[in-house]
A protein has these predicted regions:
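Short terminal alpha-helical segments
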Residues: 2-35
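Hydrophobic packing residues in well-ordered alpha-helices of helical domains and bundles
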Residues: 7, 11, 36, 40, ...
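Amphipathic, well-ordered alpha-helical segments in soluble domains
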Residues: 10-21, 39-46, 69, 73-76, ...
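Amphipathic alpha-helical interaction modules
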Residues: 25-72
Length: 110
């Protein structure tokens, strides 16, 4: 298991990636499906909540559960991105990067 402080540091980087993904979605404007927009908004909102939870979490199970929830939202965003077909390449890259970072963190915690 990674140390709680190491998880928090990694999460700070992931949160920046999620924020960049959200900004890319906004820049893409009307060219983004509602499904993808909703997935990105949920992930962005949940990451803000998760930051607070991770700051307070002391036990490994709470940290793991928080990361698992985020990774599941990352899966949903990736799936929505794939269903969207022809979307902005920068947005697609941001979604895939956020998904990959969340997946890596999850696997390191299990």
């Amino acid at each position: 298991m990674m140390q709680a402080e190491e998880v928090r540091q990694r999460f700070t980087q992931i949160e920046q990636t999620i924020h960049q993904m959200s900004e890319a979605c906004q820049r893409a404007g009307g060219n983004v499906s509602n499904d993808l927009k909703n997935s990105i908004q949920q992930l962005d909102q949940r990451s803000g909540q998760a930051r607070q939870e991770l700051q307070q979490a002391q036990d490994e199970e709470a940290i793991r559960q928080c990361v698992d929830e985020l990774e599941e939202l990352g899966d949903q965003a990736k799936a929505a991105c794939e269903r969207s077909g022809n979307i902005d390449q920068q947005l697609k890259n941001a979604v895939l990067q956020a998904h990959q970072e969340l997946s890596q963190l999850k696997h390191q915690l299990h």
